[in-house]
C-alpha cells in the first residue's frame, strides 16, 4: 500500500497539469471559434473578459443556438464538479456579426460575474448572486445586470471606433 501513494500523487498532479493547460473558453464550432477570435481582436473589452475567464475555475462552452429560448443570447450554469464550474453561453446565429460580438461581450460579463463568486455552484446560488447584483428580466428564470449592459455598450463603442474595421 505504501507504494500506491506516490502513484496516486503522480496521477493527481498529471490531471491537475492537464487541467491547467486546457482552455477554459471552448467554442463548440469553427464558426463560433471564428466569432470569439474576431471579437477578441476587435474589442479590448472582450479580450480582457476572455483572459479573466481563462484565469478562473470556470469552463465555458460557447455555442450558437437557434430556438425560441434564446432570442438573442443567454448564459447558464450547467453544473459544478469538484473545483470546476461548467457554464454555457448561447448566441443566436441569425443576428448580424457585429450584434453577435456585442452580445458575446455582454454574456462574457455574466460569466465573469459567476466566476468571481466561488459560492455560485448551482441554480439556487446563481439565482441568489444575480438577485444581489442585478434584477429579474424576461421572466423568473432570467436576470440582467448593469455591468453586462455597460460591457455591451462598451463593445459597441469599440466596434464603432475610428480606424476599426467593421465586422
What are these regions (language model features)?
Residues 1-8:
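Bacterial N-terminal signal peptides that target proteins for export
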Residues 12-24:
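Bacterial Sec-dependent signal peptides at the C-terminal "C-region" and cleavage site
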Residues 25-33, 83-91, 128-136:
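Acidic/histidine-rich, surface-exposed loop or edge segments in extracytoplasmic proteins
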Residues 33, 38-78, 98, 123-167:
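Metalloprotease/metallohydrolase-associated module, dominated by Zn2+-dependent proteases
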Residues 68-99, 111-114:
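Active-site scaffold of zinc-dependent metalloenzymes
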Residues 102:
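Residue-level recognition of phosphate/Mg2+-coordinating polar/acidic sites
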Residues 108-124:
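Catalytic Zn2+-binding segment of zinc metalloproteases
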Amino acid at each position: 500500500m505504501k507504494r500506491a501513494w506516490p502513484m496516486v500523487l503522480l496521477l493527481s498532479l498529471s490531471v491537475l497539469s492537464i487541467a491547467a493547460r486546457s482552455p477554459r473558453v471552448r467554442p463548440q464550432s469553427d464558426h463560433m471559434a471564428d466569432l470569439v477570435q474576431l471579437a477578441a481582436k476587435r474589442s479590448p473589452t472582450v479580450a480582457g473578459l476572455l483572459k479573466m475567464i481563462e484565469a478562473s475555475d470556470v469552463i465555458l462552452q460557447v455555442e450558437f443556438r437557434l430556438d425560441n429560448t434564446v432570442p438573442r443570447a443567454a448564459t447558464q450554469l450547467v453544473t459544478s464538479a469538484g473545483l470546476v464550474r461548467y457554464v454555457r453561453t448561447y448566441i443566436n446565429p441569425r443576428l448580424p456579426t457585429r450584434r453577435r460580438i456585442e452580445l458575446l461581450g455582454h454574456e462574457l460579463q455574466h460569466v465573469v460575474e459567476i466566476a468571481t463568486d466561488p459560492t455560485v455552484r448551482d441554480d439556487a446560488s446563481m439565482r441568489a448572486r444575480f438577485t444581489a447584483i442585478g434584477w429579474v428580466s424576461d421572466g423568473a428564470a432570467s436576470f440582467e445586470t448593469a455591468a453586462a449592459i455597460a460591457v455591451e455598450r462598451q463593445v459597441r463603442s469599440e466596434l464603432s471606433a475610428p480606424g476599426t474595421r467593421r465586422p
